[in-house]
């Protein structure tokens, strides 16, 4: 954050409908998380660990994020599973209140982004990182420059957004993304 951000009108207004959440850097659009129908998460919601398997061959942790999506979903769970020494899989299990709603898987990055349908190659300072959306079948990524959501915010320079918009059949399903330092994530 830049010092100027802290002086923005309502920056410290943390109520669910507060001005703070209209600023890009403070809401879920600038973080690696979900949005439903491109709406801001419920600010008074919480994510908490509801399951963990730290001693498993493929360790995992599951978060209950349901209260962050008040009035949008009846349940939202995110599981992080370490598949091997260089690959992690993120599974979002979502049960939408409206079957027509769209779940967007969003991430921001300073890396250069190359998208090929459901695969992404990130490069930054000579380092490489790979992502693949496994489910739902047919989901693809798109990329675009990050931009402010409210007039007066300090400019956002050098950040790219990565997004996959996913319709879930019957409003219930999974969004599964693998991330790895290796091109072959299997």
Model-derived segments and spans:
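Conserved small/polar residues in nucleotide/adenosyl-binding loops
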Residues: 1
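CBM-like, beta-strand-rich accessory domains located in the C-terminal region of large
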Residues: 5-186
């Amino acid at each position: 954050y830049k010092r100027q951000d802290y002086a923005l009108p309502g920056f410290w207004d943390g109520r669910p409908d507060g001005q703070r959440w209209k600023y890009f850097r403070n809401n879920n659009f600038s973080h690696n998380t979900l949005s439903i129908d491109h709406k801001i998460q419920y600010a008074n919601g919480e994510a908490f660990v509801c399951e963990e398997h730290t001693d498993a061959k493929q360790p995992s942790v599951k978060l209950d994020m349901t209260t962050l999506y008040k009035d949008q979903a009846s349940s939202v769970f995110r599981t992080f599973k370490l598949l091997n020494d260089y690959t992690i899989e993120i599974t979002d299990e979502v049960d939408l209140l409206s079957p027509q709603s769209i779940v967007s898987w969003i991430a921001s990055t300073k890396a250069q982004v190359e998208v090929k349908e459901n695969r992404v190659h990130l490069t930054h300072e000579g380092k490489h990182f790979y992502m693949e959306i496994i489910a739902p079948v047919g989901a693809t990524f798109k990329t675009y420059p990050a931009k402010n959501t409210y007039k007066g915010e300090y400019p956002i320079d050098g950040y790219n957004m990565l997004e996959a918009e996913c319709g879930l059949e019957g409003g219930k399903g999974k969004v599964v993304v693998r991330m790895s330092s290796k091109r072959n994530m299997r």
